[in-house]
Amino acid sequence: MSRYRGPRFKKIRRLGALPGLTNKKPRAGNDLRNQLRSGKKSQYRIRLEEKQKLRFHYGLTERQLLKYVRIAGKAKGSTGQVLLQLLEMRLDNILFRLGMASTIPAARQLVNHRHILVNGRIVDIPSYRCKPRDIITGKDEQKSRALIQKSLDSSPQEELPSHLTLHPFQYKGLVNQIIDSKWVGLKINELLVVEYYSRQT
Protein backbone atom coordinates (compact mmCIF):
# COMPACT_ATOMS: atom_id res chain seq x y z
CA MET A 1 0.00 0.00 0.00
CA SER A 2 1.40 3.37 -1.01
CA ARG A 3 1.79 6.52 1.06
CA TYR A 4 -1.44 8.53 1.35
CA ARG A 5 -1.61 11.51 -1.03
CA GLY A 6 -5.34 12.22 -0.99
CA PRO A 7 -7.37 15.00 0.69
CA ARG A 8 -5.90 15.59 4.15
CA PHE A 9 -9.00 17.16 5.69
CA LYS A 10 -10.98 14.02 4.88
CA LYS A 11 -8.59 12.02 7.06
CA ILE A 12 -8.61 14.35 10.06
CA ARG A 13 -12.41 14.53 9.91
CA ARG A 14 -12.52 10.76 10.38
CA LEU A 15 -9.48 10.15 12.61
CA GLY A 16 -9.07 13.43 14.53
CA ALA A 17 -6.12 15.83 14.59
CA LEU A 18 -3.04 14.57 12.73
CA PRO A 19 -0.49 17.38 13.19
CA GLY A 20 2.19 15.57 11.21
CA LEU A 21 -0.07 15.34 8.14
CA THR A 22 -1.65 18.79 8.28
CA ASN A 23 -1.87 21.71 10.69
CA LYS A 24 -5.62 21.94 10.06
CA LYS A 25 -7.87 20.69 12.83
CA PRO A 26 -11.26 18.95 12.59
CA ARG A 27 -14.24 21.16 13.36
CA ALA A 28 -15.74 20.87 16.83
CA GLY A 29 -18.55 18.34 16.87
CA ASN A 30 -17.20 16.25 14.00
CA ASP A 31 -16.22 13.38 16.30
CA LEU A 32 -19.70 13.23 17.80
CA ARG A 33 -21.39 13.34 14.38
CA ASN A 34 -19.12 10.56 13.11
CA GLN A 35 -19.95 8.39 16.12
CA LEU A 36 -23.68 8.97 15.70
CA ARG A 37 -23.48 8.21 11.98
CA SER A 38 -21.43 5.05 12.36
CA GLY A 39 -23.02 3.66 15.53
CA LYS A 40 -21.05 1.58 18.01
CA LYS A 41 -17.57 0.73 16.73
CA SER A 42 -16.29 -2.83 16.78
CA GLN A 43 -13.02 -3.58 18.58
CA TYR A 44 -11.45 -4.34 15.21
CA ARG A 45 -12.44 -0.92 13.86
CA ILE A 46 -11.11 0.85 16.97
CA ARG A 47 -7.74 -0.89 16.54
CA LEU A 48 -7.75 -0.19 12.79
CA GLU A 49 -8.41 3.53 13.30
CA GLU A 50 -5.57 3.84 15.84
CA LYS A 51 -3.26 2.13 13.34
CA GLN A 52 -4.41 4.49 10.58
CA LYS A 53 -3.86 7.52 12.83
CA LEU A 54 -0.28 6.44 13.40
CA ARG A 55 0.31 5.69 9.72
CA PHE A 56 -1.11 8.95 8.37
CA HIS A 57 0.46 11.16 11.06
CA TYR A 58 3.97 9.86 10.35
CA GLY A 59 3.34 9.51 6.60
CA LEU A 60 4.20 5.83 6.33
CA THR A 61 3.21 3.10 3.92
CA GLU A 62 1.58 -0.01 5.37
CA ARG A 63 4.77 -1.97 4.72
CA GLN A 64 6.94 0.62 6.49
CA LEU A 65 4.73 0.65 9.58
CA LEU A 66 4.67 -3.15 9.74
CA LYS A 67 8.49 -3.16 9.54
CA TYR A 68 8.69 -0.74 12.50
CA VAL A 69 6.25 -2.87 14.52
CA ARG A 70 8.42 -5.95 13.92
CA ILE A 71 11.61 -4.10 14.93
CA ALA A 72 9.89 -2.81 18.09
CA GLY A 73 8.66 -6.31 18.91
CA LYS A 74 12.22 -7.63 18.97
CA ALA A 75 13.55 -4.81 21.17
CA LYS A 76 13.65 -4.73 24.97
CA GLY A 77 10.80 -2.92 26.70
CA SER A 78 7.20 -2.18 25.76
CA THR A 79 6.63 -2.81 22.05
CA GLY A 80 4.26 0.16 21.81
CA GLN A 81 6.66 2.57 23.50
CA VAL A 82 9.61 1.41 21.39
CA LEU A 83 7.48 1.77 18.25
CA LEU A 84 6.70 5.41 19.09
CA GLN A 85 10.36 6.10 19.87
CA LEU A 86 11.43 4.68 16.50
CA LEU A 87 8.91 6.85 14.64
CA GLU A 88 9.64 10.00 16.64
CA MET A 89 13.40 9.69 16.04
CA ARG A 90 13.05 9.62 12.24
CA LEU A 91 14.78 12.58 10.60
CA ASP A 92 11.60 13.83 8.89
CA ASN A 93 9.75 13.84 12.21
CA ILE A 94 12.63 15.54 14.06
CA LEU A 95 12.61 18.37 11.49
CA PHE A 96 8.85 18.72 11.97
CA ARG A 97 9.11 18.75 15.78
CA LEU A 98 11.88 21.38 15.61
CA GLY A 99 9.60 23.60 13.49
CA MET A 100 12.04 23.50 10.56
CA ALA A 101 9.20 22.03 8.46
CA SER A 102 5.47 22.71 8.80
CA THR A 103 4.40 19.08 8.35
CA ILE A 104 6.10 15.70 8.05
CA PRO A 105 5.47 15.56 4.25
CA ALA A 106 7.15 18.99 4.00
CA ALA A 107 10.07 17.70 6.08
CA ARG A 108 10.37 14.67 3.83
CA GLN A 109 10.59 16.95 0.81
CA LEU A 110 13.39 18.98 2.46
CA VAL A 111 15.34 15.79 3.04
CA ASN A 112 14.67 14.28 -0.40
CA HIS A 113 15.82 17.51 -2.09
CA ARG A 114 19.09 17.45 -0.12
CA HIS A 115 18.51 20.59 1.94
CA ILE A 116 19.42 18.91 5.25
CA LEU A 117 22.71 17.90 6.84
CA VAL A 118 23.23 15.62 9.83
CA ASN A 119 26.59 16.06 11.56
CA GLY A 120 27.88 18.04 8.58
CA ARG A 121 26.88 15.52 5.90
CA ILE A 122 23.89 15.68 3.55
CA VAL A 123 21.31 13.03 4.42
CA ASP A 124 18.59 12.43 1.82
CA ILE A 125 16.81 9.54 3.57
CA PRO A 126 13.72 10.75 5.52
CA SER A 127 13.66 7.57 7.62
CA TYR A 128 17.23 8.14 8.88
CA ARG A 129 17.17 7.32 12.60
CA CYS A 130 18.50 10.24 14.62
CA LYS A 131 20.60 9.57 17.70
CA PRO A 132 21.54 11.57 20.79
CA ARG A 133 24.12 14.27 19.99
CA ASP A 134 23.15 14.44 16.31
CA ILE A 135 23.37 17.98 14.90
CA ILE A 136 20.81 18.76 12.20
CA THR A 137 21.31 21.83 10.01
CA GLY A 138 19.92 23.39 6.88
CA LYS A 139 22.33 23.48 3.96
CA ASP A 140 24.25 26.77 3.76
CA GLU A 141 22.44 27.90 0.62
CA GLN A 142 19.84 30.62 0.17
CA LYS A 143 17.07 28.31 -1.06
CA SER A 144 17.53 25.82 1.79
CA ARG A 145 17.60 28.55 4.44
CA ALA A 146 14.56 30.31 2.92
CA LEU A 147 12.45 27.14 3.04
CA ILE A 148 13.38 26.50 6.67
CA GLN A 149 12.87 30.15 7.65
CA LYS A 150 9.36 30.11 6.16
CA SER A 151 8.47 27.14 8.36
CA LEU A 152 10.08 28.66 11.46
CA ASP A 153 8.12 31.89 10.93
CA SER A 154 4.79 30.09 10.57
CA SER A 155 5.23 27.35 13.19
CA PRO A 156 3.17 27.76 16.38
CA GLN A 157 5.18 28.96 19.38
CA GLU A 158 4.88 25.75 21.38
CA GLU A 159 7.24 24.35 23.98
CA LEU A 160 9.92 22.27 22.31
CA PRO A 161 10.16 18.61 23.41
CA SER A 162 12.91 18.08 25.99
CA HIS A 163 14.92 15.80 23.70
CA LEU A 164 15.45 18.62 21.16
CA THR A 165 17.13 22.03 21.12
CA LEU A 166 16.63 24.58 18.34
CA HIS A 167 19.03 27.36 17.34
CA PRO A 168 16.78 29.18 14.82
CA PHE A 169 19.28 31.83 13.74
CA GLN A 170 21.78 29.11 12.84
CA TYR A 171 19.10 26.90 11.21
CA LYS A 172 20.30 24.18 13.54
CA GLY A 173 18.71 21.61 15.80
CA LEU A 174 20.29 19.29 18.36
CA VAL A 175 19.09 15.86 19.46
CA ASN A 176 19.76 15.75 23.20
CA GLN A 177 18.44 12.28 23.98
CA ILE A 178 15.93 9.61 22.96
CA ILE A 179 12.41 11.02 23.25
CA ASP A 180 10.49 10.54 26.50
CA SER A 181 7.04 9.05 25.88
CA LYS A 182 5.22 12.07 27.36
CA TRP A 183 6.56 14.23 24.49
CA VAL A 184 5.20 12.08 21.65
CA GLY A 185 3.53 14.42 19.16
CA LEU A 186 0.31 12.44 18.64
CA LYS A 187 -2.54 11.46 20.93
CA ILE A 188 -2.54 7.71 20.35
CA ASN A 189 -3.12 4.40 22.11
CA GLU A 190 -0.09 2.57 20.76
CA LEU A 191 -1.13 -0.72 22.43
CA LEU A 192 -4.13 -0.91 20.09
CA VAL A 193 -1.76 -0.59 17.12
CA VAL A 194 0.38 -3.46 18.42
CA GLU A 195 -2.78 -5.52 19.03
CA TYR A 196 -3.97 -4.82 15.49
CA TYR A 197 -0.81 -6.30 14.00
CA SER A 198 -0.59 -9.19 16.47
CA ARG A 199 -4.05 -10.30 15.33
CA GLN A 200 -3.08 -10.10 11.65
CA THR A 201 -0.36 -12.74 11.96
From Swiss-Prot:
InterPro entries linked: Ribosomal_uS4, Ribosomal_uS4_bac-type, Ribosomal_uS4_CS, Ribosomal_uS4_N, S4_RNA-bd, S4_RNA-bd_sf
TM spans (from-to): none
MF term (GO), any: structural constituent of ribosome
SMART domains for this protein: Ribosomal_S4, S4
Gene Ontology CC annotation, any one: small ribosomal subunit
Single biological process term from Gene Ontology: ribosomal small subunit biogenesis
Keywords linked to the UniProt accession: Chloroplast, Plastid, Ribonucleoprotein, Ribosomal protein, RNA-binding, rRNA-binding
Superkingdom of origin: Eukaryota
Ribonucleoprotein as UniProt keyword: yes
Limits of the S4 RNA-binding domain: 89-149
Coiled-coil regions, chain positions: none
Residues spanning the signal sequence: none
Presence of the UniProt keyword Repeat in the record: no
Primary residence: plastid
NCBIfam families to which the protein is assigned, alphabetical: PRK05327.1 (NF003717), rpsD_bact (TIGR01017)
HAMAP family hit by this protein: Ribosomal_uS4_B
Complexes and interactors: Part of the 30S ribosomal subunit. Contacts protein S5. The interaction surface between S4 and S5 is involved in control of translational fidelity.
Protein family per UniProt: Belongs to the universal ribosomal protein uS4 family.
Purpose of the protein: One of the primary rRNA binding proteins, it binds directly to 16S rRNA where it nucleates assembly of the body of the 30S subunit.
Annotated protein name in UniProt: Small ribosomal subunit protein uS4c
Source species of the chain: Coffea arabica (Arabian coffee)
Gene encoding the protein: rps4
